[in-house]
Curated annotation (Swiss-Prot):
InterPro entries the record matches: DUF2585 (IPR019691)
UniProt organism field: Rhodopirellula baltica (strain DSM 10527 / NCIMB 13988 / SH1)
One Pfam family linked to the record: DUF2585
Domain of life: Bacteria
Name of this protein: UPF0314 protein RB9128
Membrane topology note: Multi-pass membrane protein
GO cellular component, one term: plasma membrane
Similarity comment: family membership: Belongs to the UPF0314 family.
Keywords: Cell membrane, Membrane, Transmembrane, Transmembrane helix
Subcellular location: Cell membrane
Segments passing through the bilayer: 22-42, 68-88, 157-177
Amino acid sequence: MNASSSETLEVVDDRFQKDRSWTVAWIAGLIVVGMVLVLAGMGRRFWCECGSWVPWSWDIWTAHNSQHLIDPYFFSHVLHGVLFYWALRWVPRLNRTQCLLIALGLEASWEILENSPLIIERYREATMAVGYTGDSIANSVTDVAACMLGYWFSSRFPWRWSVALFVVSEILMLIMIRDNLLLNVLMLVSPIPAIQEWQSG
């Protein structure tokens, strides 16, 4: 193969990579837009009713929780991305792009399910979130972004870093708000009254 042919192949390969990147970006965008439209159709409001445009809210016991861009549960969604990356990595015949889009689709689907009346009521009955009314659309979009951040982190650093991120995040959340991803799942699936009492204390 001469130099001219080699350069031509490189140009074609670069163009293919760019086209594929744009395709992935379009699909990812459609997933997020689709989630937003579904949430809007479910009657979810875009932002906190309080009218304050402060992008964060750190007090989980107020009506601001899950209504702004960032709250303490942002870090749980980062861990979603960590878990999705390592779970999907071992699924046969899936390439990196497919794994990424599946992770994005799973997180978007969870945001829709989480804001359904069934799950909202379950949160109110079984967890410390007795006043939970669902997420704002803006918060759901940020949660998806947090998931992608965790996914990116796990894809770029050795597995030990993912473990460290998971453990440190869970411990810090437990100290700060008496809740974390593992406790949240446990209380949703099989509530333990003693834990609920401790969380509310």
